[in-house]
Structures are given as C-alpha cells and as structure tokens.
C-alpha cells in the first residue's frame, strides 16, 4: 500500500549513512536543514516523520544527492557547537529506505530548494515556507513484518548476533567507530547544552544507550525484534574508513535477500576476528620473548657481577675475533689498556640492554669499530734503499727533492733499528708482514723511546706533474699500505674529525676511516687537493687538519666519534696542492713544502718514452712494432698538440693515436708494424692547435707581452692599450680583472702621467682622452700585481706610437715612483717564455736568486734582464739602449 505525503527533509553528508530499523544520530551542518528543525523547537510527536537525503558535499552550490535516502522517525534534536559554528545533532530511528527515483518527478536542486507551502503540517511550529519533498513511501510495517518472519524461520541469525557482539567488544580493532563524526559519538546523549562540545563515547556506553532506547521504544518481550534493531544499529556504526564494504551494503540492501547481506557481514567479521587473533598471538609471542630475554639478562648480570668478584670475565664471546686476539699473548698487545677497558665496559653495557633498544645498536656499532681499528698494528717496512730508489725511478722521472726526502726517512729507520738499543723491546713481530709497535699509544709522550721522524710533505705544483702517483710509488717503495683521502670541496669539520655519537647516523671522520681501511697505523696517506678545502657555518676543516699534520700533536688526534685519542705519528702524510697561495698559512707552517716544477720538453719526452707509451700500448693490447714513434715526432706532438705543465694532455693524445692504430689493425689484420711520423700525424690527430713560431703578436703600438702564473702553470699575457677622445677622460679596464690587477693598472697610468715628459709624451691631453686597457681571454679571471711593468709599457707604447719588440717579455710590480718590486712564480713564468720562444725577459732585481730553481734546459734559452726601476726598461725598449746587466746560462 502506498500513501502520498508531503515531507520535510534534511541534508546529511554521505559518510554518515545508516540502515533501516536501526537507531542513529547525525550531525546537521546545512543551514536550511537546521532552520527547518528549529521550527519544531526540538519536540517531536510520535507520528512525526522526516526524510534524510545524503549528499557528498553540503556546502557546494550544486549539491549532488544520492538516489537512496532514509525515511526516519525523529526522536531528538539538540544544538551543539562544531568547529566554532552552530550545528544540530538529530537522533532518530530509521524506518525505511527512501528511493528518490520513485518520485513523481525528477528531483533536482532547484526544485527541492524552492519554497513550497506546507499544507499538511506534520511538525509543530508556525505554518510558513519550508523545504518540502513529495514522494511515495512503502508501508513500513509490512516490510518489517516480512523481515521478522524471515528471521523467525532462520535460527542461524541468532548465531550471527553472538559473532557481532564479539565484533563490538573488539571495536578498537575492527571498524566500529565511537567518533565517526562528531554527532555519531554523541549517540543518545540526554543532557545537551547550547555550548556543548562534541565528546566521543566508548563502546560500552554506546551499547548501554542503544539497549535503553530499544527498551523504551519497543515491547521488552520482543527479544528477537530488539536484537534485529540492535543489529541494524550496529550496521550504522561500521566505520567507512575501516570497513569500506559498508557502502556496498547500503547500496545493495535488498529486503528480498536479507540473508545474503547478513552472511557478507558475518564473513567480514569472522575474517577480521581471525586476523585479530593471529596478530594478538604474534604480539603475545613477541612480548613473551622480550620478557624472557629481560629475565635472562637480569640473571646474567647477577652472574657476571659475581664472577667479576672472582676475577673472571664472561662478557666476551669465544667466537669473537677480538676475544681470540686477547687470548693470544702477542696479539693482545695490539690494544692499549685504556681501549680494552672501554670495550669491556661498553660490552657489559650492551649486554644489559634490550636488543630492540635503539641505543643498543649504537653501542654495538661503537664497540665493533673499536675492535676493528688496528691500534698498534703496523706493517713491516722494507728497509732497502736500493730497492726504494729503483721503485721511485720506475714511476717518476725527475722530482729529485721528493725522492731524496723519502730515502732520508728510510735511512733514519735503518739507523734506528741498527743503533737504538730499545728498538727491539718496542716492536713485537706478528708475522713476516706485520708487527706490533709498542711505541704507539703511550700514555705519556715522555715514555717514548723510539722516534721515527716520519715526514709530512706537501707537494705543490700544476696538474699532471705526478703528485698523486708519487704517493703510490712511496707506499710501494716502503712496503706500506696506501690510502687516498680527497679533500677537494670538503667544507664540514666533522668530515675530518667525525660526528659525535649523539647524532643519528654518526660515523668517524675521513682520517680514522682511512686507518680502518688500511688495517695498519703506519700507512701512506695522500691528502689530495688540500688547497681546495672550503669553510662554512659547520666549521673550518683546515683547522681540523692542523692537528693531523702537526708532528707534535698528531700522536693525540681526537676523533669525535671515537671520543678517544688516536696515534697518527707513524703515518706518512703527503698533501697535494696546485696553488701555494691557496694553502692556509697555518698548514704551510706544519709541513715540508716541496714544489714540483712544470716538466720541460726533454722531461716530457723522457716521461713519454719510459712511462706513457708502454702504458698506452698495454692498455689497448698493441704490439710495440705497431706503435713506433720517433723522438722527433714526439717533440712535435708536445710542442704543437699540447700546452700544459704536466703530461695528462700528452697521455690523452697518445691514447688517441693508439685507438686509431687499433682500428687500422682491425681493418687490416695483416698489419705488422706502423710508424707514427710527421707525414701521417695530421691524419691521426687532426690539425695542430698550437703554432709556436706564429704565436707572437705583431709589433704594433699599444701591445706588450707580460708573463703570468696560475694553478695550471705559467702563461703569457698580451696586454693591449687603445686611446680615444672623450669628455671625462680616465681609464677603462676589461678582461675579467680583479681588484689587485685593476689597482696595478691605475698605478701604471698615474706613473706614466706624472712622468709624461720623460717618456716623450708632450701633446697628449689625459683629461680629454680615455685609455682603454684590455687583457685578452676575457672569460678567465686575472689578478695580481706582477703585470704592473707590462701595463706601463703598453700605455707608453700606445701614447708614443712606438711598438714594443715581440721578443721581449716582462714581469714585475710597479710603484708610483717607478720602482720594480719582486714577484712570485718566476719559474713558471720562465716556462711560459720558453714555450713562446721569447728571448729576453725583464725581471725584478730582487728575484735573481730565484733563477737557481729554474731547470737549465729552460734557462739556456732565455736572457734575463734584472731591473730595479722602470726607466731601465724604458731606455732599452724605446731608446734602443743596451742593458747594463744581463744573466745568461750556457
């Protein structure tokens, strides 16, 4: 039977869906719905009815409604505050589904929200304009009776209630929500206040409230009906987030197949209960194991304490390598007593901790690292000066000063073993390769009886001059382990000293890591690119290196991770740098600085023939006959295809030639030999990029050749000057010049202007002309005062229109009074003049002593003209006077 009615409706969010015949409550946020319920003054008659329409979002202008709503009997409505806004909590009993699609017309927002006059007022209050909804409602009592008959015939439903009761009792684990929305948590609350805030109920309170409402609303004797309504109420409490199947139950709810619905929920509950049982069992087992572990550890602690009183130590595992070493009379001397005590204490501390504790893992890692370090273990030196000299000569040509220093150190070691009476008492042999040096890790420096005078070197020179490979050769010559530590870009002090163990992911610094990697405390350490360390807010790593490189301090090096001193006094540290000026002064004061010269042409030829060519042949698996290169061709390659201080570029050129020959051999299997000559060189390498005879500039006014020095070695510097009229006059500088070089140009101009008559500049108006000074290769930054005399010469040449001979170059700082001050990098600048085939070089008189460090091969090709004042240069270049003093080498 169907009855047409005019009904009020309220809009509720879709995540608060409920089921027919159950009790529930919802939070009403939509303002029109609130105004509707306020007209009832929250007092409902028994025959009052409403419709709940579900919407995805009640705040948007175009509300999208679900096709299925609920026909309800309102029980109570109270005002609450929700997120600072007024809201209503509506308590109701759901009577039936309300299918919007069965209405006599299609439901849409415009029609529903339009005002319809309430003719059948089914709620108390003033008759007026309210939201209404028209449709057909099935006879609720008939549907309920049919469902109850189905329940009476199926006794299995009673078993379902016991299952569902278990689910309710475990609501925290399975999908029953006690605060699904703020309103749901306030289910059946009796005392509301206008300012009440929403509070969640626990599941026992909800069960009690549901039972009380069912008892009030139904005949208590109807036990089956009570259970049925309680079941449908529980359905409404299923949390959509934990039980997404609730949405399917709501949409597919079919009165004709209610048994299927119950079975689906029952299956879910049984699966959830089984899963919960398994999880609970695993947790219980884990907790039992932890409790068992705790009890055993406590017992072990008491036993260990008692054994300790008897002088017995049971904290160590016999399978531990460290324990085996302690039982060995020789190996136990490897560890200082203080370290053994720390390991023992930390091991005991670890044994008393729960292994699941985060701190336990930190303590374990710390102890393992202490055991891993070599401490007093060192490798035996090969005390053979002849062998060491052969190895050093094998890998490097030249570099006499470094080789001599290493041989001196080897001589000291031999002398110590021969004449020091205490030496044998301080060293315990392990095997033919390793020994224990008891002179390490002395508690007091005064206790030391053997001093090895271990060198700490700093090799400074251009790239490609063999600094890095030299350290490898030294380690092989002395039979020591080799460790490379790259310092380029390091800007955090903790990378050197390590991190404190309080930090997450703490680890030792690069130095201690290197010692652990080497496995001995007397390795050769290469500190590569020490001049490229940086500093920031995290500290200055160069300051940390002071302790490493100071022979007076490195016996007590402090690493933050170890929190113990480590003796680095037996380690040979070899630092490398490209530019002397970039090394902190404090570090320079602590090391022996050995400058490596750029290689001369003859040295490059020797290096190529003895080292590079054999290496290239081996790398590409060629026969020597297929890589036949005469010395003439090799010299041509060095002069015309490379321009460098070292030999890295030469190595790449030779690699390229070798690959070309390999291709020829693959294409011509019968090829037995191949000669690399000047005739086929262009075919193999292309056009030569450098043409030394044609590199000199044309002799035109305004150009002078200077000499410069950078991290890559020496280079020539052609300075150009041009003059043009302007209103303000002055000087214009281009070519990426830095401050010192700009000041040098300003000084040169001031000096020329103040001595204009002496230089033959009579009619030039400095105030109406701009002097533009340019230094080519503008992309390369340039700095330094040594171009002062070159600036002066170029300015005078431009203003007098007298050219400077292109076989002259110069270097020197100039003052406002014309004095020529000393400069640095004379050796590198001489190399640049040599490559440029410049015959005469002006140098400051104070730099004469530096000529001794320049290789004879270079000096023989250059005539040096030392000067004290600039006018000496002027007289030679512009007045054709012969120099009073020249220095030549035959």
Swiss-Prot record:
Domain (Lon proteolytic): residue spans on this chain: 698-880
Binding site for ATP: 461-468
Keyword ATP-binding found: yes
Localization per Swiss-Prot or TrEMBL: Cytoplasm
Gene Ontology CC terms, in alphabetical order: cytoplasm
UniProt-listed Enzyme Commission number(s): 3.4.21.53
Record flagged with keyword Cell inner membrane: no
EC class (word): hydrolase
InterPro entries reported in the protein's UniProt record: AAA+_ATPase (IPR003593), ATPase_AAA_core (IPR003959), Lon_bac/euk-typ (IPR004815), Lon_lid (IPR054594), Lon_proteolytic (IPR008269), Lon_Prtase (IPR027065), P-loop_NTPase (IPR027417), Ribosomal_Su5_D2-typ_SF (IPR020568)
Subunit composition and interactions: Homohexamer. Organized in a ring with a central cavity.
Residues of the active site: 786, 829
Keywords assigned: ATP-binding, Cytoplasm, Hydrolase, Nucleotide-binding, Protease, Serine protease, Stress response
Induction of synthesis: By heat shock.
Domain of life: Bacteria
Role description: ATP-dependent serine protease that mediates the selective degradation of mutant and abnormal proteins as well as certain short-lived regulatory proteins. Required for cellular homeostasis and for survival from DNA damage and developmental changes induced by stress. Degrades polypeptides processively to yield small peptide fragments that are 5 to 10 amino acids long. Binds to DNA in a double-stranded, site-specific manner.
Family: Belongs to the peptidase S16 family.
The species this protein was found in: Mycoplasmopsis synoviae (strain 53) (Mycoplasma synoviae)
Protein's UniProt name: Lon protease
An individual GO BP term: protein catabolic process
Pfam families per UniProt: AAA, Lon_C, Lon_lid
One annotated GO molecular function: ATP binding
Substrates-to-products reaction catalysed: Hydrolysis of proteins in presence of ATP
